């Protein structure tokens, strides 16, 4: 359905700092699409992916598309949900795509009830319905495993056409020492990821 619609798109080439060039042009875009960086070296020497750098600097949603993937139907969508500001932003940035989806699954490691007794993930499903996301929607709880491992495993078991998630940023030395969920997902997933910061 999306491929049949007319969309106003633009392509640009830039010299110099790639991330700065994308950031400067992204201010006037609804969505930025970048390719996943194919790193040939060892995992220990992998630089931050361009997609992550663009996400934390441009203020726009970024669709990171793996090199081996052709965009097709976005019928089955997973939403990585932790209730954070970044996750909320990602969901709202993705609403036009979520409305077109046939199936939306909220993937979370949040408990079934918050301090005020609400189920945060179920509340998100209700919110999505109010915004026209009338789909086969449900919640999958990941349990206590590290977030990026559990999320990656669930997405790989699929079948999903798109992952929507918040993009997190920490000081560079923390990312080097501890790694990061956003970087881990962007480096390893084989489906497009829509990320907002």
Language model: regions and residue ranges:
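Gly/Ser-rich helix-loop-strand patches that form or flank binding pockets
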Residues: 19-70, 154-197
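A short helix-to-beta-strand connector/capping loop
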Residues: 3-10, 131-136
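Well-ordered alpha-helical segments embedded in enzymatic catalytic cores
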Residues: 21, 89-93, 150
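A structural signal for isolated positions on well-ordered beta-strands in alpha/beta enzyme cores
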Residues: 10-12, 78, 103-107, 136, ...
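Short acidic/Ser/Thr-enriched loop-to-helix initiation segments
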Residues: 44-60, 66-131
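Charged docking surfaces used in two-component/phosphorelay signaling
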Residues: 11-20, 140-147
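Glycine/small-residue-rich hydrophobic helix-like segments
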Residues: 103-169
